[in-house]
């Protein structure tokens, strides 16, 4: 149920909770991690924030980020494998298929042909938090659902063309918002793409 982005967004918008956190491993695979976190919390009163990247490790490709940005600017679709793999069902940048967010043809290629998704369920954009604050009308700084693509956000009308390849039929996106320096590769890549 925690992968239901519409339900999560309604909880965020209508529940009155100040903060909602859903871990990236929302299925039964996360039960043992949740039990361990609860035990730690009971003993220590808090649980340190952990990384969602707990899987096998691959070499990072930070030295190739400029080449990646150039390939993306040429409207290419790229398979990305770098660092430790994600835990949970969402591709959070270490095992991902990436493309530009502003191209409807790429949406068809990536979402419908490669990932076999329905036309109304496009893939998700990745953006810096400063961009999310500007382009998404209902994004608030620190929104925890955006850390693992577990909520939807309305795109401001003047920016819909920038998200034409990833926007849902109702004008929302399931965004991965980069905060702090958690993902240096994607952060640098997104910054470089602004040049193209």
Protein language model features and the residues they cover:
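Flexible beta->alpha loop and helix N-cap segments adjacent to enzyme active/binding sites
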Residues: 2-196
